[in-house]
Amino acid sequence: LPLVADIAAAGHQIALHSATHQYSKIYASTDAFWQDIRTLRQALEPYVDVAAIDWLRFPGGSTNTVSHRYGGNGIMKTLKAQAEDKGYHWIDWNVCAEDATASHPDAAQILRNIRRDADGQDTCVVLLHDTKATGQTVKALPDMIAYFREQGYNFCTVAQMDALQCETK
């Protein structure tokens, strides 16, 4: 986690996701979800100003259906409303690298997936993963960045994009 301080100092935005990423636990109830977020905030507290973190991404996305198995059909709708009530903004992706799938794609396939999903999009929010099992993502990253620049995209934080401070393609 100390790396998070360096990431924030470099101007990157820190957002909340999950302390455990265990759907069966975090989506068992809304209380379980928010406890997981509190645990994450406590872990980050020594490294960044957690009071300034007001963005999150729901594991599986805000429209995931796997959560229904654990917390019922309405849990995501309730969590989204609660997030807004708590002062959080939440974001989903529209471009998926598919880098965390069981097939473990190589860097070339990750880039093909991104190009496929980005085609026709004015604004792209790309889902990438940084686990040990997804080492190919790091290898694909320079080519991803080059691709988006060649296509005329600009890079910005989610907060900048939300505030329309970052021009779309």
Each predicted region: which residue ranges?
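Short, well-structured secondary-structure segments
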Residues: 6-8, 13-17, 91
